Amino acid sequence: MFEIIPIKGGVNAPQGFYADGVSAGLKPPLPNGAPALDVAFLYSEDVLKPFTLFTSNRFQAAPITHFKHFIKGKESNFVLINTKNANAMTGERGVQDVCDILSSLTQKFPFIQNPIMSSTGVIGQYLPKEKIIASFASFDFNAKCENAHTRAADAIRTTDAFSKEIALRVRLDNGESFCIGAMAKGAGMIQPALATMLCFITTDALVPQNEGDRILRECAKTSFNAISVDGDMSTNDSVFLFANGRSGVYNEAAFKEALKMIMHKLATDMVRDGEGSTKLVAFEVCGARDESQAICAAKALTNSLLVKTAIYGEDPNWGRIASTIGASGVECNEESLRIAFDSVVVFDRGQICFDEENEARAAAVMEQESFRITCDLGIGEGHFVAYGCDLGYRYIDINADYRS
């Protein structure tokens, strides 16, 4: 058995890691005139091989290409993150820009080994190399400021309304413990198959090198690969897990449960922070022929514009839900389908349960900031939960002006 305890510190909570955020002038100043944080770093006192997940978009951004060609399989102790510019669709020049920036970094700080770069922002623009390189003068690895992790989480934001970070301590029955910390960004271009996001996870658990990638993939299946804001897949999606083993402690079940909690929290925060969203909705599909069909139906619901706009209008239009399931290609029929808003059943095995009272109850459910729509296909044992949000006017406002 084990106990999982929330703690402070974000990615800096585990032993041997330090992250901070600085301003490179990539973002405009804040309303009060102060410079906005737009470059972050994550430094590990130990060199290690990170466990990774990347976007399945065929047009992968230059930082991902650089990692796969120059860093993969090597030990690293540093990640440099910039916002405002994705360095995607920039070809060979984009990769060379990454090489130039990281070369300047290692010249200034010789203790940095095989640094990794991660970018997020507008696609199709070249990096402002000089500004990013100039920001290195603000890097302080000795300050160990208590709020540095918060600055780092703030610096990686793009259209995010709030920073996303979390830290947990896992205590085993024998009294031994380890920590996991994380920070992430993501609010738009969120689509299953990672989502448009960056996530950096640190731990002092002694994770075996041959287990980390598998566990990361398994935890992503029900978190980052189970969310959607707008159905668009980014070129830059990346998840990094750094494990230095300093605690000397590891228990697979405990580690996996804590990592799953962290990734689920960050993933649902992304949906909750979806550009212009006001609702977080869990779309639970059960009774499908198998898990793959449950996944297909659940993700179809998260991406349906008609379903999303009905949620925004707090309209329990269950017909849109049924139609989306029917169009998803999964095995289903009216006689076995059951649809409920939380505990309010509106359609049950071919019977419409949508009288005036039930409609009012379902509408009341939809007034909440977070609720569940359950669709039981009544065919098999397949089950999956995907997370989505509504779609309102604010999403259009944000994305119509995104480059400005």
Swiss-Prot record:
GO-annotated molecular function: glutamate N-acetyltransferase activity; L-glutamate N-acetyltransferase activity
InterPro entries: Arg_biosynth_ArgJ, ArgJ-like_dom_sf, ArgJ_beta_C
Catalysed reaction equations from the record: N(2)-acetyl-L-ornithine + L-glutamate = N-acetyl-L-glutamate + L-ornithine; L-glutamate + acetyl-CoA = N-acetyl-L-glutamate + CoA + H(+)
UniProt-annotated catalytic positions: 196 (nucleophile)
Cell compartment(s), UniProt: Cytoplasm
Top EC category: transferase
Major location category of this protein: cytoplasm
EC number(s) reported in the record: 2.3.1.35, 2.3.1.1
Residue numbers marked as site, Cleavage: 195-196
Pathway(s) it belongs to: Amino-acid biosynthesis; L-arginine biosynthesis; L-ornithine and N-acetyl-L-glutamate from L-glutamate and N(2)-acetyl-L-ornithine (cyclic): step 1/1; Amino-acid biosynthesis; L-arginine biosynthesis; N(2)-acetyl-L-ornithine from L-glutamate: step 1/4
Presence of the UniProt keyword Amino-acid biosynthesis in the record: yes
Keywords linked to the UniProt accession: Acyltransferase, Amino-acid biosynthesis, Arginine biosynthesis, Autocatalytic cleavage, Cytoplasm, Multifunctional enzyme, Transferase
Amino acids binding substrate: 158, 185, 196, 275, 399, 404
Function: Catalyzes two activities which are involved in the cyclic version of arginine biosynthesis: the synthesis of N-acetylglutamate from glutamate and acetyl-CoA as the acetyl donor, and of ornithine by transacetylation between N(2)-acetylornithine and glutamate.
Subunit structure, as described in the record: Heterotetramer of two alpha and two beta chains.
Family of the protein in this entry: Belongs to the ArgJ family.
Protein name according to UniProt: Arginine biosynthesis bifunctional protein ArgJ
Organism whose genome encodes this protein: Helicobacter hepaticus (strain ATCC 51449 / 3B1)
Underlying gene: argJ
